[in-house]
């Protein structure tokens, strides 16, 4: 059985985009993020999603999360899940070295992504209502993968097989 109750208590960003050194205590319950444009509000939300998905919703190039004047970006979080304290630590360097730790112990991306569950809803997700069926499927696939990590693996295998099948059919048509 899955336990979905968790609370993010602390978030620390070091050289994450424009957040050079930011520590947030999120233990007060209700959080309101207020600031002028380009002050890092979206970066805070993105970093939380990044910890759960190990990718940014805004870029496919992880080097872009590193502050221009730094060599490494780091995201640290403390959360409580099923009455157990858990720490997450993600660091990424311009040399593309990635370190993932859960409770101070290095771990795999698969195990890391199983700790924090988030579902991102952004203005781009308005495509759920007006966009293509493929946009709806992509959003739903991301949401299901958060709840059932094995789904992500199966989906990747399915996509590879589908691409192979399509390539095979194209070759078959060319040969006919």
Task: Give names to the regions the model predicted.
Residues 1-2, 84, 174:
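N-terminal leader/targeting segments
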Residues 2-50:
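Pre-Walker A-like glycine/lysine-rich segment at the N-terminus of P-loop NTPase domains
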Residues 15-16, 36-38, 110-112, 136, ...:
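Short, flexible segments with low predicted structural confidence
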Residues 28, 39, 43, 60, ...:
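Generic alpha-helix structural propensity
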Residues 45, 49, 66, 140-141, ...:
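Conserved protein kinase catalytic domain
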Residues 53-129, 133-135, 139, 144-147, ...:
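Nucleotide-state sensing region of NTPase/ATPase domains
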Residues 147-168:
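Amphipathic alpha-helical coiled-coil segments
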Residues 169-176:
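Secondary-structure edge/capping motif, primarily at the C-terminal ends of alpha-helices
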């Amino acid at each position: 059985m899955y336990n979905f109750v968790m609370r993010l208590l602390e978030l620390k960003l070091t050289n994450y985009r424009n957040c050079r050194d930011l520590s947030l205590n999120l233990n007060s319950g209700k959080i309101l993020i207020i600031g002028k444009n380009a002050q890092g509000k979206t970066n805070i939300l993105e970093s939380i999603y990044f910890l759960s998905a190990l990718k940014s919703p805004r870029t496919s190039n992880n080097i872009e999360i590193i502050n221009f004047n730094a060599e490494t970006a780091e995201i640290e979080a403390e959360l409580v899940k099923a009455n157990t304290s858990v720490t997450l630590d993600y660091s990424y360097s311009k040399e593309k070295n990635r370190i993932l730790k859960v409770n101070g112990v290095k771990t795999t991306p698969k195990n890391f992504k199983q700790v924090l569950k988030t579902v991102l809803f952004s203005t781009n997700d308005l495509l759920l209502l007006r966009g293509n069926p493929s946009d709806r499927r992509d959003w739903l696939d991301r949401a299901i993968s958060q709840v059932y990590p094995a789904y992500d693996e199966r989906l990747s295998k399915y996509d590879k097989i589908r691409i192979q099948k399509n390539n095979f059919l194209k070759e078959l048509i060319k040969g006919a």
